[in-house]
A protein has these predicted regions:
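Short, well-ordered coil/turn segments that N-cap beta-strands
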Residues: 49-54, 85-88, 112-116, 146-150, ...
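Short, acidic/polar
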Residues: 68-81, 129-144, 192-200, 272-277
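Beta/alpha (TIM)-barrel catalytic core signal, keyed to glycine-rich beta->alpha loops juxtaposed to Asp/Glu
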Residues: 97, 157-343, 347
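Conserved, mostly hydrophobic/aromatic
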Residues: 44, 56, 89, 104, ...
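Active-site mouth loops of central-metabolism enzymes
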Residues: 60-72, 121-131, 260-267
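Short alpha-helix boundary/capping segments
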Residues: 1-6, 241
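N-terminal binding-site loop/beta-alpha segment at the start of enzyme catalytic domains
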Residues: 17-18, 24-30, 34-116, 173, ...
Length: 347
């Protein structure tokens, strides 16, 4: 009887996660046969950078009843991901009410520094002056326990916020930090329409940028989304792209039956989340797809998706477009739960 290769792959990933999540003081324990997973990687045309296509977003760790990070579970998740080949870890100054960076720093202190890429971001809303930004940058290095950041971003830019950062001298100062070796790659994350994004993108020789992109957020009807045009601009400008919210804050991980029907007709055993991730990963200029995995089953599923990654076929792309059309007819407010827009503009 022929075996389903996807089922075999998922079984292997589940076995890896089960083994690693039998925690030994929070450290990953991986049997030798499982040490090398076929994690999809993307090569950058500079500095021999090779990132895992799946990146770990450190904004949605499992939490305890009091809202603090469940550090034992979260560390096991991070170690499991790294053991399976994930090498890009993305945090930020405000994540988990300021606790993500210190926690991530404690975990990565147990890893070899050259074995992973670390990303964090400058919170411009906390910067009334360049001195504020300098203080925060030094604090981030201290929190993370490192002397350089692999990928450093201006956080959550729109055109007006970017102009403010330039006017205070922050953009120039961060380029100076790159020249000094304290930043290896300098970029930005953006929550603006395609016109605002294009203005920022073309204004500096950015090393990379980060956008919200998924099969629902393809136009820029919402003022904070740059959509397909934003993606096209990154190709035109030759700027490597990192994707946030590929599953739209979980919306695309649990679809209504009617919406999922075109997908399940082609791959009955594939999860809804895997379709969303494969749609994003099928774009050639996408170098990292961030996923904020807060539970073991989410990590297991995502590792299975990115083990020997398969781009969408033409028929699968058409099925995703059917699903997107159905969802657009039903969804009134496209909230991802990121809280960047608070207070909520929709009330």
């Amino acid at each position: 009887r022929a075996r389903n290769p996807n089922a075999i792959r998922l079984f292997c990933i589940q076995k890896l996660c089960y083994t690693v999540l039998n925690r030994r003081n929070g450290r990953a324990f991986v049997p030798s046969a499982a040490k090398r997973e076929f994690m999809e990687h993307r090569n950058w045309n500079k500095n021999n950078i090779r990132t895992s296509l799946l990146g770990y977003g450190c904004m949605r760790f499992p939490t305890k009843a009091d809202g603090t990070i469940d550090e034992e579970r979260a560390e096991a998740l991070l170690n499991t991901a790294k053991a399976a080949g994930v090498n890009y870890f993305d945090t930020a100054y405000p994540y988990h009410n300021g606790q993500s960076e210190p926690f991530v720093g404690r975990v990565i202190a147990k890893w070899g520094r050259s074995s992973f890429y670390l990303a964090t971001k400058m919170p411009l809303w906390n910067c009334k002056s360049l001195d504020d930004a300098k203080r925060i940058f030094e604090e981030q290095l201290q929190r993370l326990g490192v002397d350089y950041i692999d990928f450093y971003l201006l956080h959550s830019l729109h055109k007006a916020r970017y102009e403010k950062a330039k006017a205070m001298g922050l953009v120039d100062w961060l380029w100076q930090q790159k020249a000094a070796g304290r930043i290896r790659n300098f970029g930005f994350s953006c929550h603006d329409n395609s016109a605002g994004f294009e203005y920022i993108l073309r204004d500096q020789p950015w090393d990379f940028c980060q956008l919200q992109y998924n099969y629902l957020d393809r136009d820029d009807r919402a003022e904070e989304i740059s959509g397909d045009r934003g993606y096209q601009l990154t190709e035109e400008c030759g700027v490597p792209l990192i994707i946030m919210e590929p599953i739209k804050g979980g919306t695309l991980a649990s679809l209504p039956a009617d919406a999922a029907a075109p997908l399940h007709a082609l791959r009955p055993d594939a999860t809804d989340a895997s379709w969303a991730l494969r749609w994003v990963g099928s774009h050639r200029n996408v170098h990292v797809i961030l996923s904020g995995m807060s539970a073991e089953d989410q990590l297991t599923d995502n590792l299975a998706t990115f083990a020997r990654f398969e781009p969408l076929t033409a028929a699968e792309t058409a099925a995703v477009e059917q699903t997107a059309a159905f969802l657009h007819s039903r969804i009134k407010v496209g909230c991802t739960g990121c809280r960047y827009c608070m207070p909520c503009p929709m009330g």
